[in-house]
Amino acid sequence: MQIQRLCFIAASIFLPASALACSSCGCTLSSDWDSQGLSASSGFRLDLRYDFIDQSQLRSGTGSVDRGNIALPTDREIEQGTINRYTTLGIDYSPNANWGVNLQLPYVDRTHQTIAEGDTMASSSQSNGVGDVRIMARYQGFTAQHDVGIQFGLKLPSGRHDDVFASGPQTGEPIDRGLQPGSGTTDLLLGVYKFGALNQDFDWFAQGIAQVALDSRDDFRTGASLNLNTGLRYMANPTFTPELQLNARVSRRDTGAQADVGNSGGTLIDLSPGVTAQINRSLHAYAFMQVPLFQRVNGFQLAPHWTASVGVRYAF
């Protein structure tokens, strides 16, 4: 089971991912206050984002695993690597300062290579397709400043979950459910956030959001998760806005006969520096890099050394 069940993010919830994650794998980044609706302004916003996550590091617990020390064949799967590319269209609409809705439409491009239990050669897969769509409503009419809000919505099972290995000893066998473009489940999303200004040059946000599967599909149920995010940005120059985020995710194990229970779930904490550039009054571009500060995984899971995200946002 890939660490993507842990990663995804806040990013995938709002922009990604998925990102949350980039959809189901990758960064926990919240790439922009305004494109997420974390502002008191109304209107339409479109966001197009690309996330790149190269999961090349095999980890267990809080440490890395040297594949060279594992004699083959072995009695467990030894994953070799997973490269994830997510392209996500985000559509956000606020009819007024109190209410808003956000729709995330992800496209997943993923290559994966692993050595299955009992094998001595690697098997590979290639997955391309629409991921799980997310729709979130928000209400922020609790204060006169509209700076505190709640979020509620669903992750829908729009991505397929029947991809198989394309080459190697496992050709034709289904790949791990955690590697499929979709989970097959409908998930409930509940969150709370606050944003504001520290002074005339700095503002900040804090956010927590939980994700819980409401059902199971084909003997698989995604583990419940909690994302916690906070960020600070420097606003003195409106054309060039540097930003720093701290992102954390705690995920429980997946369950069901088709779940890799022993190799799912854990805790991730990441640091995410980035910058947003104003191209014109309505158009902004942004870029972020995310690096791990702490990783604790159950069993054996793949993790990235870093992730990268770029995107553009247009406000009507």
What are these regions (language model features)?
Residues 20-68, 145, 157-162, 177:
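Outer-membrane beta-barrel biogenesis signature
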Residues 40-42, 83-87, 127-133, 146, ...:
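Residues that define the transmembrane beta-barrel architecture of outer-membrane proteins
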Residues 36, 48-50, 89-93, 103, ...:
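Residues on the lipid-exposed face of transmembrane beta-strands in outer-membrane beta-barrel proteins
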Residues 59-69, 216-316:
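Outer membrane beta-barrel transmembrane domains
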Residues 44, 99-101, 145-148, 200-204, ...:
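Repeated loop/turn-to-beta-strand initiation elements of outer-membrane beta-barrel proteins
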Residues 107-222:
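Outer-membrane pore/translocation modules
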Residues 44-52, 103-107, 150-156, 206-210, ...:
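Transmembrane beta-barrel strands of outer-membrane/channel proteins
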Residues 33, 73-77, 118-125, 175-180, ...:
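Extracellular loop and loop/strand-boundary signature of outer-membrane beta-barrel proteins
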